[in-house]
Amino acid sequence: MIKVDGLPYWRLSGFYFLFFLTIGCFMPYWSLYLKSLGMNAEAIGILSAIIVVTKIFSSFIWGWIVDYTGKRMHVIRYTSFFSLFSFCFVLFFQDFWSLFIILLIFSIFWSAALPQVEATTLSHLGEESDRYTTVRIWGSISFIIAVVALGNFFDYYPINYLLPIVIFSMALVWIHSLFIPEVSSSYQKSDNSTFKAILFKPR
């Protein structure tokens, strides 16, 4: 039995569900969509790797912004919206360089949400961090559902349906983020929240 108490359990687990539902819709089938555009293996590899590569620097930048402002949920909401907004441009462009630029911008915003939601979840859990798995598991469930469901769906329908499905799922992520409460705390932004201070901060 899941004990909710003061934890916004369904709002947090709902975000994981929708976020990984989106990933389950997008990641396994994105290369198939690119192949349908006539792109070769090299182009598909590059356009598929952008999301992974941008995490190297973008997560650090968004983490610094959160540390500086103390507005974690604001960052999650804004980046979720601009992820949706930027990805919509994929509907209008099909050439390599246009998609490269669109995905680069999209990836910078998209990579912000999950690390900050993880931090928000752990902050809400406080000393009950052992309950983290009961929240996070919904992401695993939705990922499996998305992969299996779309695998069967694309046996009967063209891969072009992928884009509206992903966009709809991203819209749900953004809308749901509006209902996750900020962690109430006496958070004070640090005077040392600079790139240099964070980079050389001993762990």
Protein language model annotation of sequence segments:
Residues S129-L150:
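Glycine-rich segments within core transmembrane alpha-helices of 12-TM secondary carriers
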Residues L84, A146, Y161-F179:
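Symmetry-related core transmembrane helices of the 12-TM Major Facilitator Superfamily/SLC fold
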Residues H74-F89, I167:
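Structural signature of the two symmetry-related core transmembrane helices
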Residues F17, S86-V90, F96-L114, T120:
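Hydrophobic core of transmembrane alpha-helices in multi-pass small-molecule transporters
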Residues I2-K55, R203:
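Helix-loop boundary and gating motifs at the non-cytosolic
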Residues F57-K71, F154-D155:
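Helix-to-loop junctions at the C-terminal end of transmembrane segments
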